[in-house]
């Protein structure tokens, strides 16, 4: 029988995920600009939803690109 260990979240439980913190948000994006899933990032469900909202806000305000044009060319 396998023993599963819970991963520690890279963001502390009460840390605020700010849409203006582009450096933090970019750690959770792929090279193509997609948001990494929970199973890879190790975030909790609540943190992942807050991260998703923050990334979407940052994209709308042009702080983050919607897609990485360097990958297309």
Swiss-Prot record:
The keyword Transcription does not apply. One of its GO terms (molecular function) is small ribosomal subunit rRNA binding. InterPro entries: Ribosomal_bS18, Ribosomal_bS18_CS, Ribosomal_bS18_sf. Keywords: Chloroplast, Plastid, Ribonucleoprotein, Ribosomal protein, RNA-binding, rRNA-binding. GO terms for cellular component: chloroplast; ribonucleoprotein complex; ribosome. The keyword Protease does not apply. It comes from the Eukaryota. Signal peptide: none annotated. It is found in: Plastid, Chloroplast. One of its GO terms (biological process) is translation. NCBIfam families: S18 (TIGR00165). Part of the 30S ribosomal subunit. Belongs to the bacterial ribosomal protein bS18 family. This is Small ribosomal subunit protein bS18c. It comes from Guillardia theta (Cryptophyte). The gene is rps18.
């Amino acid at each position: 029988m396998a023993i599963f260990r819970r991963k520690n979240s890279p963001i502390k439980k009460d840390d605020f995920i700010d849409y203006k913190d582009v450096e933090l948000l970019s750690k959770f994006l792929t090279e193509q600009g997609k948001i990494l899933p929970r199973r890879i990032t190790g975030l909790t469900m609540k943190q992942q939803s807050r991260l998703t909202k923050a990334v979407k806000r940052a994209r709308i305000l042009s702080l983050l690109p919607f897609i990485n044009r360097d990958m297309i060319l």
